[in-house]
Design a protein with these regions (language model features):
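Short loop/turn segments immediately following the C-termini of beta-strands
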Residues: 30-32, 78-80, 125-127, 135, ...
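Short loop/turn segments immediately following beta-strands, especially the blade-tip
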Residues: 42-48, 89-95, 133-142, 191-197, ...
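Beta-rich, blade/repeat-based domains predominating
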Residues: 34, 58-69, 106-118, 151-173, ...
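Loop/turn-rich, solvent-exposed surfaces of beta-rich toroidal or solenoidal domains
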Residues: 260-292, 296-322
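A short beta-strand motif characteristic of beta-propeller blades
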Residues: 51-56, 98-103, 146, 152-158, ...
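Blade-loop segments of beta-propeller domains
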Residues: 52-117
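Bacterial Sec-dependent N-terminal signal peptides
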Residues: 1-23
């Protein structure tokens, strides 16, 4: 009897460990090639192995984010017409997906989405705007509440001649939203007031000809890091009450390709990664000083063509990079001590892959 009880306990323990190792991985794509929408996979964050689970037809789901309970997926449809939308998808057991609702962004080419509590946001690149949605109690429907417009003012007359908003994210303190105003070389601030946003001025003005693109925050919320597309630089900031104070600029794109893309911190906050496109494509690697927030460049990992977006597994063991023009997701094993990356050559074949997100099972 003791043996049977012990055996059951051991089996249960092994099952729990295996369950923690497995993630539901959701991939967004552009559908002008061989893809038809969103794909779900089971990804083992200890072995780096992936297995496809389901797919859902959707036009250009180029950016995705999950609800806090991972039951809802928010996906943009990045189109330059009235079909540009925010889509809400149910994520079921075993990665099954069902489209619940869609709402027009009323801003062309939504390329980023964030959701928290009763609000969802899309950054509409060609529309030059940020759309603010109120979510239903169950999180299965979205109603457009308002739009905020970006501006121009940057010196690049071909890339900054009309407004572009590229990213909108909630601050860690839960009180503000920051949006990258690409063409005006600034980051805008909005105060959260219940189910609405109130304009809160300029969080920071960045260097001219930067083209601010994506923003991420340190775990403790004291620092923020910006990847700028045109300058190819990462800017480190101190964050406080909806404002950013620049403390450092450091080069990510060392060849001046003007194709800076995505940016993420490792789960432990000790390393930062930024991707670069168009020339010498790859991911720049930086160490982070925990006390000051300052960065030191320590490496560079070449990738496939056009590394538009990437993400790290929750345990920090792997970095997965969406290489749009190579039609694959590269799987890199990450040394958690040094922060450096090694290509596992376990590529996941996905046509026009541009976004990957993870949820624990």
């Amino acid at each position: 009897m003791r043996f049977n009880v012990f055996s059951c306990m051991l089996l249960c323990s092994l099952f729990c460990v295996q369950a923690q190792d497995n993630l539901t991985m959701i991939v967004g794509t552009y559908t002008d090639g061989g893809s038809h929408g969103v794909y779900s996979y089971r990804f083992n964050q200890m072995t780096g192995e992936a297995r496809v689970l389901d797919s859902l037809a959707l036009k250009n789901p180029s950016y995705l984010t999950l609800s806090s309970d991972a039951r809802r997926l928010y996906a943009v449809s990045e189109t330059n017409d009235e079909k540009a939308s925010l889509n809400i998808i149910n994520i079921g057991r075993n990665g099954t997906m069902q489209l619940l609702s869609s709402a027009a962004t009323e801003g062309a080419d939504p390329c980023y989405v964030a959701a928290k509590g009763a609000l969802a946001l899309t950054a509409n690149y060609s529309g030059g705007s940020m759309s603010v949605f109120r979510l239903s109690t169950k999180g299965d429907e979205a109603a457009l509440a308002t739009r905020f417009l970006g501006a121009t003012g940057g010196p690049d007359r071909s890339r900054q001649n009309v407004p572009h908003v590229h990213c909108a994210c909630f601050t860690p303190d839960g009180r503000y939203v920051l949006a990258t105003d690409f063409s005006a070389d600034r980051i805008l601030s909005y105060r959260i007031a219940g189910q609405r946003l109130v304009a809160n001025g300029v969080a920071t003005q960045v260097s001219a000809d930067s083209g601010p693109r994506h923003l991420t925050f340190s775990r403790d919320g004291r620092f923020a890091y910006l990847m700028s597309e045109l300058s190819g630089k990462v800017t480190a900031f101190r964050y406080s009450q909806g404002r950013l104070e620049s403390i450092q600029e450091i080069v990510s794109d060392s060849v001046g390709a003007r194709g800076g893309a995505d940016i993420h911190l490792s789960p432990d906050g000790r390393f930062l990664y930024s991707s670069n496109r168009l020339k010498d494509e790859g991911i720049a690697i930086f160490s982070v000083d925990a006390a000051s927030g300052l960065l030191t460049r320590i490496g560079y990992q070449p990738t496939g063509a056009h590394p538009r977006q990437f993400n790290l597994t929750p345990n920090g063991q792997f970095l997965l990079c969406c290489c749009r023009d190579s039609n694959k997701i590269q799987v890199f094993r990450r040394d958690t001590k040094t922060g450096l990356l090694t290509d596992t050559h376990k590529d996941i074949s996905v046509s026009r892959a541009v976004c990957v997100q993870f949820a624990s099972e």
